[in-house]
């Protein structure tokens, strides 16, 4: 029996609102998955455990519901006045398909925390105590989203 080789990719499983998803820093993905296309889609499908003809996603991080079959890819934004760029993928449970056309407001609520903890936000924008305002470019829908993240003791 032959097995595909495994690679290590840093990621965080996060909850935002009623949804859960796997968050990635774009620069941590393999080169082939840093650009849109089949390699990126196949990686997201594999991580979530899709397609699963039984609808269970037992071989991945998905939990067999549309609210838990999600991925987020973040990077520093190249746009002025934005801290991070956010790409959202809704992963089908039973089909080999990732929908990159929409956004998940629930997981967007977790983007600021991930961006700060991953070092994607300039440290000068993060108070020791108070509220950090994070400007997100949501690449799927081409909109600016502003989130506020409470900070205690840095």
Where are these predicted regions, by residue range?
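A glycine-rich beta-to-alpha transition motif near the start of alpha/beta enzyme domains, typified by
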Residues: 1-154
């Amino acid at each position: 029996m032959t097995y595909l080789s495994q690679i290590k990719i840093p990621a965080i499983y996060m909850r935002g609102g009623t949804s859960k998803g796997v968050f990635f820093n774009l620069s941590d993905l393999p080169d082939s998955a840093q650009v849109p296309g089949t390699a990126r889609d196949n990686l997201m499908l594999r991580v979530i455990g899709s397609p699963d003809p039984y609808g269970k996603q037992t071989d991945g991080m998905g939990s067999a519901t549309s609210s838990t079959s999600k991925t987020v890819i973040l990077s520093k934004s190249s746009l002025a006045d934005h801290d991070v760029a956010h790409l959202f993928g809704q992963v089908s449970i039973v089909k080999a398909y990732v929908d990159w056309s929409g956004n998940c407001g629930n997981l967007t609520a977790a983007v600021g925390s991930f961006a700060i903890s991953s070092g994607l936000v300039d440290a000068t924008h993060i108070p020791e105590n108070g509220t950090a305002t994070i400007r997100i470019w949501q690449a799927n829908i081409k909109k600016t989203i502003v989130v506020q993240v409470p900070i205690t003791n840095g």
